[in-house]
């Protein structure tokens, strides 16, 4: 059965997900660009992929929920309004990063923190680097990693440094520094294809759900089972 996908935010991520979807036999029924006038009730879509700006992501998602459509949100920087999404009683998937590698980095970082906090000489820090068109700084992925480390028991503040350079897809490093050595856990995205494949996997996974608000942890845990 051919699934019908609507994309809000037809930029780099939106186009990458569209390519994967079409290659998998889906059809794209709507491509919403900046300043377009749109109504999700007119799309005849099965699901929506949202990848725009932090200030518009929640309102876009709420419009789709009101139209009865499940939504995958790839935009970051809007999580201060998460309660609005949760209270809307729709079917939503969101992630600060759709890379499976980043999810593994987060899990390893949690374990690493539990070990490293036993040694008071080590101080954690996070470094992230992205392309110059990246809108939020530090990245949502870096902020998520910081929360994971803090929750896992880090006793010292976690400093985050962010930089923007041309043609950098995405680099994240968790560093543990002491006076005698440095331990670095690093993830570098080589292309956007990994994000797009993860985004498409999230679309497929969410289609099986009736309602709820889900994250990468939910999807990966479900796949593990």
Regions found by a protein language model. Give the residues of each.
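Glycine/charged-rich beta-loop-alpha catalytic/anionic-binding loops adjacent to active sites
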Residues: 45, 87-95, 178-185
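A short helix->loop->beta-strand "cap" motif at the edges of active sites that frequently abuts
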Residues: 67-70, 88-90
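Rossmann-fold NAD(P)-binding glycine/threonine-rich loop
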Residues: 55, 62, 75-95, 100-112
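Amphipathic, non-transmembrane alpha-helical secondary structure
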Residues: 58, 62-66, 106, 110-113, ...
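C-terminal substrate-binding/catalytic lobe of Rossmann-fold NAD(P)-dependent oxidoreductases
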Residues: 4-7, 12-42, 53-55, 120-225
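N-terminal Rossmann-like NAD(P) cofactor-binding module of classical short-chain dehydrogenase/reductase
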Residues: 48-49, 72
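Anion (oxyanion) recognition and catalysis
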Residues: 22, 65, 86
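A charged, well-structured terminal subsegment
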Residues: 111-122
């Amino acid at each position: 059965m051919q699934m019908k996908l609507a994309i809000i935010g037809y930029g780099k991520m939106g186009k990458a997900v569209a390519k994967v979807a079409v290659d998998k036999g889906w059809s794209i029924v709507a491509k919403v660009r900046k300043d377009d006038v749109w109504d999700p009730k007119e799309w005849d879509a099965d699901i929506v992929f949202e990848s725009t700006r932090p200030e518009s992501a929640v309102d876009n998602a709420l419009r789709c929920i009101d139209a009865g459509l499940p939504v995958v949100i790839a935009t970051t920087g809007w999580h201060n309004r998460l309660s609005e999404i949760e209270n809307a009683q729709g079917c939503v998937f969101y992630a600060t990063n759709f890379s499976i590698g980043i999810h593994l980095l987060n899990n390893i970082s949690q374990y690493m923190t539990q070990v490293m906090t036993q040694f008071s000489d080590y101080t954690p820090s996070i470094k992230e680097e992205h392309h110059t068109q990246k809108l939020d700084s530090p990245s949502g992925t870096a902020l998520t990693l910081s929360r994971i480390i803090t929750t896992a028991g880090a006793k010292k503040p976690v400093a985050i440094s962010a930089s923007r350079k041309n043609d950098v897809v995405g680099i994240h490093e968790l560093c543990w520094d002491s006076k005698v050595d440095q331990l670095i856990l690093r993830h570098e995205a080589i292309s956007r294809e990994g994000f797009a494949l993860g985004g498409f996997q999230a679309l497929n996974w969410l289609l099986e759900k009736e309602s709820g608000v889900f994250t990468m942890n939910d999807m990966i845990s479900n796949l593990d089972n």
